[in-house]
Every structure is written in structure tokens, then in C-alpha cells.
Amino acid sequence: TQEDIQNSGAKTAFDAVSNVPGVTINSFSASGADFGGMDSRTNIRGLDRGALVLVNGIPMNLNGKSGIGAIPTSAIERIEVVKGASSTLYGAEALGGVINIITKTPSKEGGSATVAVGNRGSKRFDLSYGTDRFLFGIDRKYWGAQDPSTPVRYDYTGRKGYDYYTTRNKGNSLGVFMSGKLSDKVTLNYNRAESRSSFGLISTETNPMRQAHHSTTYNYKDDRNNVSLIYKDDNTTGTLFYNDRTMRGESRVHSAKQFKPTDTSYVARQYGMDVQHEWDFRGGKDYLIAGITGKQETYRATQAPVYTRPHRNTYAVYSSYSREINPKWTAILGLRYTAISDPIKDQHVLTPQFQVLHTINKDSSMYLNIGKAYTMPSLSDAFRSVNRQYTAVSGKNLKPEEGWNYELGYKRMNKKDSWKVDVFYMDFKNFFQWQPDANGRPTVRVNGGKFHN
């Protein structure tokens, strides 16, 4: 809840989700900001890239990354976390679960301002203001350079002939959030995130000329935009959404004077829509949710000698039926069919889910959850730079990462406390791994072994 988030001291959504049991975070930069191509990660139940992140029900995952470090807590109403395979209602990438960040909606006039200053060049400025029709928030953060603190990276293969360590230079980030009520049923949301980061790979050689020749500084400009138009009445919800990310990198060998663009620069975009309706039966005891969704993902390498523009189209129909067997027992059955037009190989995926809920008393309940989930490889995974030429490097037999989640749990919630305990088993196959190309670089995405937890 909003009160829990405030009491935790979290500054961003990235900080807030770290307090949820079973959710782990990892960030290479300050305050959860992405560090160039080294993205911050949000994982559920130990599964890397297994969390689907939503904002107001809109998918934030873009090219396999979510990036929630730029959403200030001043813009958040609450955060919902659903653990376990959840592809039936939410689609791809929900192998470990779903994190849904619900932002504040315009309700009343008022605002807040925060100024914070810390060590190592840390500064933060946060401002938010809203009326009954419009809400605006901005969050600006700065961080200074850090002394080398990472361990020396050893040249185990002996190919380079030198070791090196990493440094983090000063940087900053900007988060902007706006929400406006166009009518009582229509809301328009916009979020922009900017990050400016820099780091160095510094040779440990003592010879100044050799050290300069083998040391490199990298600068990154990372911009994201997220727009959603949401219609909601008593039984129907419809959304239109657009996400993009522009990554621009440059590097300079210390023996050279000028920076040069890196071949990891890219532009990724996602367009989509979702419409769902709910029907009630037997006086509200039972209900059926059914919907359709469609989206297109695109990826463009902006600095590669040969430009590539792979894209993926995804269409799905889904439904979930809840049946009250008696006041103590409820069963839920869901099914989703997804058709994927993919540049590597078209896919057709069925993801069922079965749940049983048992109410013990007004505070306690037990549940059983069995569900299937899947995720597709990122477009940038399938198209990599080989000999400075972007090409499709994954084989036509590349399959989605998919599997089952089995879970039995107990939860208790009241005004004084809430707690939950469960036993789960995750069984996934076609786990994504990297395979070396002809030059020994790990650039070829393949299906490897299995994941169990």
C-alpha cells in the first residue's frame, strides 16, 4: 500500500519491490538506474528475466527489460505482486510472476516537494502536484563518481595479457510522470525516464602508454517513454499503449582523443492494445473474464554497419472462469491462446491455469495454483553483431522458454498484521543460454537445459 511504501523509505518503485519476500533486485547503478546496457533487474523466485512488470496493467517489459528505477514513490498508489506462472491472464514473460505498479490518479488538489543531499555527490529533488483532474510528478537524481571498489577482473584465458578493474563515473537520472482524467471513464498516463551514466574499464598495467591503450571509458544516454490510454467502466477495460527505449552509447580508448559510437546502440518500440470484459453469474457468485490483446515489438540497431529491423507480432485471446462451489470453496480455470509471428520462428502457445481457493475464516485462507507460462527471446538476442555485421544468429529451432508452476499456500490478513507461507515447485524447459560464435563471443542464443526451483 501507499502507507507501506512511505514507511519503508523507498524512493522509487525499484526500491519498493525489493521489500517484497521472494522478489530480488540487482542494479549496476545508483537508485536502480540502468547503467547503459547493464540493466537493472527485477526477479521473482530466483528466475532471471522471469518477472513481467506492469504499470496500471500496461506491460513495461521492452526487449526483455523493465526499468522501474525512474518511477518515484510519490507517483505510486500501491504495488501488486502475483507470484507464480501467470501467462494465462498476462501473457509472455510472467514465468516467475507479475509486478503491477498502480500509479495515483487525480483526486484532489495538493502537492509535495522533497530535497535530499548525501555523500559521494548524491542529490535528489522530487516534486509532485495534482488536482481532481490532473497529476504531475518529477524526480531528479544525481550521483557522483566512486573510487574503484570492484575486484580486479583477471584475464584467466591469457588472451589479453593484462587485468583490469571497473570504475563508476558521475551521472544523473530524470523521471517525469503525468496522469490526466479525460473523462470519468478515460485516463491518459505518460511516463518518461532519462538516464546518463558513465563507467570505465581500467587496465592494471603499470606502463602508462600500455595502460592508456587498454583502458576504455563508456558513456550512455538512455531514454524511455511510456504512454497509455485506459478506458474503464463497471465491466469493461480497454487499453492502448506505446513504449519505446532509445539507447545511445559511445566509448573512448584512453590513448585516443575522441569518443566513437558503440555498436550496442539501439531503438526498441512496442505498440499494443487489450480489451477485456467481465460477466457476473448467480448473483455475483461466479464470474467470467474474457479478452483479446495484440502488440507489435520492433528493434533497430542504430550504429551497426548493416541496419536490422526485426519485429514481432503477438495476438492472443484469453479467459478465466471463477466458480463458487460453496461459501468455503472456489475454483478458477483459465486458458490463453497466443499466436506469435516471429522473425526466427512463428509460435503457437497454449497456457492453462487452475486454482482452488479455500476460505478458513474471515482472516485466513488456503490456495492451490497450477499454471503454465512462457517467454520469447528478446529481438536483440536473436539478432546480434557478428564480425560487425548484424545478422540472425539463432537457429530456426529456437523455442520459447516455457514450463509449469505448482503451488500450495496459506495466508492470513487482518488489520494488525498479514503473513503468507507457501510451498512451490517451478519446472521450466528450453532455458535460454548463450553459445559462442565462430569468434568465440557468446552471441548465439540457444535453448539450453532446464530450470527447477
Question: What are the language-model segments listed below?
Answer:
Residues 116, 128-220, 430:
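Periplasmic-side early beta-strands and strand-to-turn transitions of outer-membrane beta-barrels
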Residues 104-129, 164-170, 399:
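Short strand-turn segments of transmembrane beta-barrel domains in outer membranes
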Residues 13-16, 40-43, 54, 66-67, ...:
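N-terminal periplasmic accessory domains that precede
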Residues 41, 58-83:
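Short acidic/polar hinge/loop motifs at secondary-structure boundaries
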Residues 118-120, 213-234, 266, 345, ...:
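Outer-membrane beta-barrel signature, preferentially recognizing the C-terminal barrel domain
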Residues 135-136, 181-195, 219-352, 357-359, ...:
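Face-selective signature of the C-terminal outer-membrane beta-barrel domain
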Residues 63-64, 110-114, 157-166, 203-219, ...:
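Extracellular loop and loop/strand-boundary signature of outer-membrane beta-barrel proteins
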